[in-house]
Amino acid sequence: MRTFDKSSKLDNVCYDVRGPVLDEANRMQESGIDVLKLNIGNPAPFGFNAPEEVILDMIYTLRHSQGYSDSHGIFAARKAIMQYCQIKKIKDVALEDIYTGNGVSELINMVTQGLIDDGDEILVPSPDYPLWTGCVTLAGGKAVHYICDEQSDWYPDIEDMRSKITDKTKAIVIINPNNPTGAVYPKEVLEEIAALAREHDLMIFSDEIYDRLTMDGVAHHSIAALAPDVFCVTMNGLSKSHMVAGFRCGWMVLSGPKERAKGYIEGLNMLSNMRLCSNVPAQSIVQTALGGFQSVQEYLQPGGRIYEQREYIYKAVNDIPGLSAVKPKAAFYIFPKIDTKRFHILDDEKFVLDFLKEKKVLLTHGKGFNWGEPDHFRIVYLPNLEQLKSAADKLADFLSDYQQKL
C-alpha cells in the first residue's frame, strides 16, 4: 500500500524554535505539568496588550474588511508604511513598492522563493532567526552563514562575510535589531555591509521587525536609508512593537535601483497575487498603529517592564557560574554562553531538554539559531520579574551539579 512521506525539499529544513524540544514541552503540559515557555517571542500570553486604539480600530473596520484587498495591500496601510519609510529616511518608496504580508514570516518565504535558483547562495548571519535559513534551503539555495562576533557586541564580522562571497552569492541577509542576540548595528557596520553589497552586486534583505524596540538611547538605522544605490528589501511589522503577533501583520518595502530588479519584482508580484492578499482586518490597523502614540516606548524606559526584565535577566545570567552574556540593546531575547567544558556539554539540544524535564522551563538551544557550537542558548525575557526570578533560580540550581551524559 502506498505511503506518503514529506517532500525531499524539506530534508534539510528545520525550525527548532518550534521543534522537538517544544514537542516534549507540549507532551508534558498535556499530562498536567506546568511548563514556563521561554522559547518564543510572543508578547500577549505574558500580559502585554495591544494599544486600545488599535483594537478599537480593528473592531470598527471589521465589517468593511470581509473581502479580498489588492494583493499589495489596502491603500491606507501602504500609505502609512510609505510615510514610515520617510521617517526612517528610506528614499523613493512608492505605493507599488510596498507589500503587506501575513507577518514577516510569509514575506521571508516569498522573497526567497522569488529570487533563488537551485545552488544560489545567500549570506545569512550566525546566529540567525532560523526561518531565513529554512526558507533559503526550501527555495533550493544554500544559506552560507557569516559570523556575528560575540566579543564585538554581536556585530557582523565583515571580513568573515567578505570571505564567504562567491560567484554564486545573490544576497546578504541582515537581522537588525538582531534575534537572538538583541544587538543593534551602528551606522559604521551597516555602511561596511552596504559597501560589500555594492562591490559584489548583491541585494540586501533587511529584517527590521524589532526596530521600535531599542533601549538605552540606541538609535536604529535602516541600511536602505544609508545605501539608496543598493537594491534593498526591508521588512517590518506590528507583531512585536504593538504586541499583536497573532494578527499576522507585516510588510516589506523595495528601495534602491528597482530598474535592475524588474524580473525579480515581476516574480514577487506573481507570488503576491497567488496568495491573493494578506489578512485584511490586520491591514486595517496599520495606519492607526504607525500614526498613533507608540506606547511600547513606555516598556523600554527605566521602570518599564521590558527594560526592567532585561536588566534583571542580564545580571541573573552573569551571576550564574559557567554562564556569561552580552547585554541586549533591543527586542526581548538574551543569548547566553555556557562553559561547555565545565558542564561536559557536547549537545546543546540535550542540555535544554534535560533542563526542561528537570525544571519545567523551556529554552531554545543555540544550534536552533544556526550557531555552530553547542555553547549558547536563548532566553525570552517577556515573563514578569517574579517568573523570571523563578526561571533564573531554577537554572542556577540545575547548573550547580549538571554534567551532561550522552
What are these regions (language model features)?
Residues 2-103, 110, 277, 289-292, ...:
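N-terminal small-domain helix-loop-helix segment of the aminotransferase-like
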Residues 31, 139, 199-200, 230, ...:
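Helix C-cap/helix->beta junction micro-motif
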Residues 55, 225-304, 314-315, 399-400:
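Conserved core segment of the aminotransferase class I/II
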Residues 114-136:
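Conserved PLP-anchoring active-site segment centered on the Schiff-base-forming lysine
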Residues 144, 149-220:
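Active-site phosphate-binding strand-loop segment of PLP-dependent enzymes
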Residues 162-163, 344-350, 354-363, 369-406:
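PLP-dependent enzyme catalytic core of the Aspartate aminotransferase-like
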Residues 287, 303-317, 325-339, 373:
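Conserved glycine-rich beta-strand-loop-beta hairpin in the small C-terminal domain of fold type I
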